[in-house]
Amino acid sequence: MKLSHLLTSAVSVLSLGLTVEGHFSRSRNDAVGPKRPFKPLPYSHPRKKVCHVRSHGDGRDDSAFILSALKSCNNGGKVVFAEEKEYTIGTALDLTFLKHVDLEILGRIQFTNDTDYWQANSFKHTFQNATTFFQLGGEDVNVYGGGTLDGNGQIWYDLYAEDPLILRPILFGVIGLHGGTIGPLKLRYSPQWYQLVANSSDVLFDGIDISGYSKSENEAKNTDGWDTYRSKNIVIQNSVINNGDDCVSFKPNSTEILVQNLYCNGSHGISVGSLGQYIGEVDIVKNVLVYNISMYNASDMARIKVWPGVASAMSEDLQGGGGLGSVSNITYEDMYIENVDWAIEITQCYGQKNMTLCNEYPSNLTISDVYISNMYGTTSSARDPNIGTIVCSSPDVCSNIYVENIDVVSPSGTNDFICTNVNESLLQVNCTSG
């Protein structure tokens, strides 16, 4: 059986939602597969106490009930959100004090649509103006149950269309968590990114079901599935993502990241970056393995995006360029694509439309030891006759980029690549320009 058939079969199970049922296994390492984490994940000890979260059930803020239950069952307990109940959160919750506690979410949690409150009180992070409804952190924390977190995103999609400088909260903020499991869970209608994983380590995401599109003419933008930032030894697996931006994005200083067994639809691919955005900052992404991915109706599959060495403006609320750093030991292996604009995109001119200026100011960030292999499927007509682009801003900042066994064609049957400032002898593709 061809790899594409294997991937499609695996994805059909995911798309039915079967992976979001079940319960948490305390042996995190046994749950990871088929590829193993870069380092063993820590063991989670049994819980000895149970706390049930109360709910008003009428849309009033349940944050006080949630906080009370978490404090009562912290250090060795389990907090249960009942299946038949709906919970409302209207207060920014700092949950970084958690230790040795489980959150079993069986019901539905919805965040209020008070945009003025959330812009003023959500948790602010310096990178790319990120904000979160809440921040969950601490040590040995597990969140599971198959229930739903709803970000009430529609009001934010419409508001962002009017004002691109508003601060839209991220639905699920994992901030400073060391040892934990997230999933199975359903995440719906995030105002911005669905999950930010920052300053964290040894965390497994397993069985996450992401979906939520705009119901108006205003698109749901920047709805990344995951963004890892200043984090290490993170595993993301067995999940279904229907969104409108990166399926997974490895932001600055993400190391030892394993991503496997994902179905991504409507996304911008699985991306390293963007990196090099801030002058004076050193961005490092290394030791990343992406394995067994099905990508549909997307702009990219395998993507590395680096800002040039000169100030650039991607949009009014996203500007940068001139930062330092490196990308190294990145592997993409076994991928199936349908209707994807670029099978592979590597650029060091992210955000800069003036290519002459970009070439005059090459990126300060190097890319080395990249391995992309075993990709099957078809691209969209958007870039036909090209199916990929590997463009470095200077031959001095890219080395050891290997591409092999790419069985992908455009709608017209071509398989051309744009190749610039890269060692073409390491690329088993049809480079037609450079």
From Swiss-Prot:
It is an enzyme of class 3 (hydrolase). It is found in: Secreted. Its main location: secreted. PbH1 repeats lie at residues 231-252, 254-274, 327-348, 362-405. One of its GO terms (cellular component) is extracellular region. Keywords: Cell wall biogenesis/degradation, Disulfide bond, Glycoprotein, Glycosidase, Hydrolase, Repeat, Secreted, Signal. Optimum pH is 4.4. Transmembrane segments: none annotated. Coiled coil: none annotated. The keyword Glycoprotein applies. Its EC number is 3.2.1.67. It holds the Pfam family Glyco_hydro_28. The active site is at 245 (proton donor), 268. Optimum temperature is 48 degrees Celsius. GO terms for biological process: cell wall organization; pectin catabolic process. One of its GO terms (molecular function) is galacturan 1,4-alpha-galacturonidase activity. It catalyses: [(1->4)-alpha-D-galacturonosyl](n) + H2O = alpha-D-galacturonate + [(1->4)-alpha-D-galacturonosyl](n-1). Residues 1-22 form the signal peptide. Glycans are attached at residues 113, 129, 199, 253, 265, 292, 297, 329, 354, 364, 423, 430. Belongs to the glycosyl hydrolase 28 family. Specific in hydrolyzing the terminal glycosidic bond of polygalacturonic acid and oligogalacturonates. This is Exopolygalacturonase X-1. It comes from Emericella nidulans (strain FGSC A4 / ATCC 38163 / CBS 112.46 / NRRL 194 / M139) (Aspergillus nidulans).
